[in-house]
Swiss-Prot record:
Record GO terms (molecular function): metal ion binding; metalloendopeptidase activity
Species, as recorded: Arthroderma gypseum (strain ATCC MYA-4604 / CBS 118893) (Microsporum gypseum)
The organism's taxonomic lineage, starting at the top: Eukaryota, Fungi, Dikarya, Ascomycota, Pezizomycotina
GO BP terms, alphabetized: proteolysis
Class of the enzyme per the UniProt entry, highest EC level: hydrolase
Record localization: Secreted
Keyword hit for Signal: yes
GO CC annotations on file: extracellular region
Keywords per UniProt: Cleavage on pair of basic residues, Disulfide bond, Hydrolase, Metal-binding, Metalloprotease, Protease, Secreted, Signal, Virulence, Zinc, Zymogen
Family annotation (Gene3D superfamilies): 2.60.40.2970, Collagenase (Catalytic Domain)
Propeptide boundaries: 20-188
Family statement drawn from the similarity comment of this UniProt entry: Belongs to the peptidase M35 family.
Protein name: Neutral protease 2 homolog MGYG_04094
Cofactor: Zn(2+)
InterPro entries in the cross-refs: Fungal_M35_metalloproteases, MetalloPept_cat_dom_sf, Peptidase_M35
Length: 366
C-alpha cells in the first residue's frame, strides 16, 4: 500500500504538491423571491423569481434548485424540526460546468417541485410548517458564466400544511436504508472494505489520517487563534471555543486508528448520490459517508493553497455531518470562504464547511 509521508505526531500532516440559512438581510437587498405552495399532501412547489433588472445565473448545488435529495426546506412540527432523512453533499466548487446553473432572466420565474416526505420523517402526519432561507451562488455572464461572483439571499413565506400520515408513509424515502453487514475495518470509522479498490482504500486511509491530524491541530489552535476563530465563527466566547475544541476532537477521534467507529465510510457510492459535481456525501440519520469518483480523481490529498478543497478536508467536512460525531450534526449553510464567512455566529457553528476551512487555515497559516 502506498504510504503518504508523515511526521510522527498526530498533528503533523501528510504533505503533497488546496439550502441553507444565511445572515438576515433587509428584503430590499434580496435579488430573488421564493414562494412556497402545496400541490399535494407533501408535494411542494417553489417559485423562484428574479426581482432585478439583470439576468442571474444560479448555481443549483445545495440550493432549492438542487436535483439531489438535499435539505431544500426546513420542516417544523410543534416547534421542533422534523427529522431529515436525505443527503448532505460536498460539491466540487472549481471548474463548474454551465449545466450546474439555472439562468433566470430579469423579472422572470422558474419552478422547482419536490416531495418533502422523501427527505423527512412525516409518518406521524399532522400540522407542519415549511419554510426556506439561504443563499444561491450566482455567476457572471449571460447564460454561460460559471465563475461565482455573488450570492442571492432569500427567505420564503411560511407554508402551513396538515399532512395525511397514511399518504406520507406511502412515499418512498429518497435514500433508503443501508445494510451494514459487510466487511469492515473497525478501529475507527468503519471502512466498508468491500466497497474499496486497493487504491481507493489507500487514499481513504490517508485522508482519514490527515483528517485526524487537521482536526486535532484545529482543536489545539482554537483557544489561542482567536483572530482566526472570529474570522470563521464570528465569536470568541468561551462557549464557542469549548464547542469548537469538543467537535474537532470528536472528528479527530472518529478519523483516527484507535477509535471504536461510530460511522461507516464507503469508498464508493451504493445509494446513487454521486451525481455530477458531488465529491462525497453523508446520510446523517444513518451515520454513513460515501465517496464519489471525483473525490479520488479531482482532489489532492492535502491542499497547498488556502481554502482549496482536498481529500482531507472533504472527509473532515463529511464527518461533521454525522450525528454520532457532532450533535446536533452540522448542515451545509455556506459553501466556500466568502459564503461561509458571511454567516452569523450561530450559523457558522452549525456549518460543515466552516470547520473544513478553519482546519485548512490553521494548517497553512492562512
Amino acid at each position: 500500500m502506498q504510504i503518504l509521508a508523515a511526521l510522527s505526531a498526530i498533528g503533523a500532516l501528510v504533505a503533497t504538491a488546496t439550502a441553507a440559512a444565511v445572515p438576515n438581510a433587509p428584503a430590499k437587498q434580496s435579488m430573488i423571491d421564493i414562494q412556497l405552495s402545496a400541490t399535494g399532501n407533501t408535494l411542494i412547489k417553489a417559485t423562484i423569481t428574479n426581482k432585478g433588472d439583470k439576468a442571474l445565473n444560479l448555481l443549483q448545488f445545495n440550493t432549492i434548485l438542487d436535483k439531489n435529495p438535499t435539505r431544500k426546506v426546513r420542516v417544523y412540527q410543534n416547534g421542533t424540526e422534523v427529522k431529515f432523512t436525505g443527503m448532505l453533499a460536498r460539491y466540487k466548487m472549481s471548474n463548474l460546468s454551465p449545466d450546474y446553473f439555472t439562468t433566470l432572466g430579469p423579472k422572470s420565474s422558474v419552478e422547482s417541485t419536490f416531495d418533502i416526505a422523501r427527505t423527512h420523517d412525516l409518518t406521524r402526519g399532522g400540522k407542519i410548517t415549511v419554510m426556506a432561507s439561504g443563499t444561491i451562488p450566482t455567476a457572471e455572464g449571460h447564460g454561460n458564466g460559471t465563475s461565482i461572483t455573488g450570492y442571492a439571499r432569500y427567505e420564503s413565506n411560511k407554508l402551513e400544511l396538515d399532512v395525511d400520515a397514511k399518504k406520507a408513509s406511502s412515499v418512498a424515502q429518497a435514500m433508503g436504508k443501508v445494510n451494514k453487514s459487510r466487511s469492515t475495518i473497525d478501529k475507527r470509522t468503519n471502512i466498508d472494505t468491500s466497497s474499496c479498490s486497493q487504491s481507493q482504500l489507500e487514499a481513504l486511509e490517508g485522508a482519514l489520517y490527515n483528517s485526524a491530524a487537521l482536526a486535532q491541530a484545529a482543536a489545539e489552535a482554537a483557544p489561542q487563534s482567536t483572530d482566526t476563530v472570529a474570522e470563521f465563527f464570528k465569536s470568541t466566547s468561551r462557549n464557542t471555543i469549548k464547542t469548537l475544541v469538543s467537535r474537532f476532537q470528536s472528528v479527530a477521534r472518529e478519523s483516527t486508528y484507535v477509535n471504536d467507529g461510530r460511522t461507516t465510510y464507503y469508498c464508493t457510492d451504493s445509494m446513487n448520490g454521486c451525481s455530477p459535481g458531488v465529491l462525497a456525501y453523508t446520510l446523517p440519520d444513518q451515520n454513513l459517508i460515501f465517496n464519489c469518483p471525483i473525490y479520488y480523481s479531482d482532489l489532492p490529498p492535502l491542499a497547498q493553497s488556502c481554502y482549496e478543497q482536498d481529500q482531507a478536508t472533504t472527509t473532515l467536512h463529511e464527518m461533521t455531518h454525522n450525528s454520532a460525531v457532532v450533535s446536533p450534526f452540522c448542515d451545509d449553510l455556506g459553501y466556500g470562504y466568502d459564503d461561509a464567512t458571511s454567516l452569523s455566529a450561530s450559523q457558522a457553528l452549525q456549518n460543515a464547511d466552516s470547520y473544513a476551512l478553519f482546519a485548512n487555515a490553521i494548517y497553512l497559516g492562512c
